[in-house]
Amino acid sequence: MSNEYKIKPEDIKDLINPMGYCYASDTITIDGLPVGYMHREKSEDEEDSGWRFYSGTETEEYVEDEHHFMMFDLNYLANCDPTIIPYLKSKKGIELERVEGTDKFREIKE
């Protein structure tokens, strides 16, 4: 796997107001897959948006390897997959999965 990011810094557009950073899987930021699952947890610090993004293709072993995840400005993820934008102001604790074949997400309720 190459460590070249999907979007070069000079190609990033301001799609959202600053909201802090997030963590995202390399399957999105390097491999270019769309977001398939996202959740918002309690922030680690003042700059942490709480958002965590996955393509949904990651295995348990993949997720357990911290080297497969990086911290990004939330706007970078919005550039990678703009379909997440309508959901970014959702409350902490929410879990969302993509409705297969669409640009929409639905809340996962336990």
Role assignments for model-derived ranges:
Residues S2-Y23:
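Negatively charged, low-complexity tracts enriched in Asp/Glu with abundant Ser/Thr
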Residues Y5, Y21, F53, F69-F72, ...:
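Phenylalanine-focused residue identity feature
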Residues L15-P18, S25-D31, P82-K89:
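Short, solvent-exposed secondary-structure boundary motifs
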Residues M19-E47, W51:
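Amphipathic, interaction-prone secondary-structure segments
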Residues M38-Y87:
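Acidic, aromatic-enriched beta-alpha/helix-loop junctions
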Residues M70-E110:
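Short, compact, well-ordered microdomains
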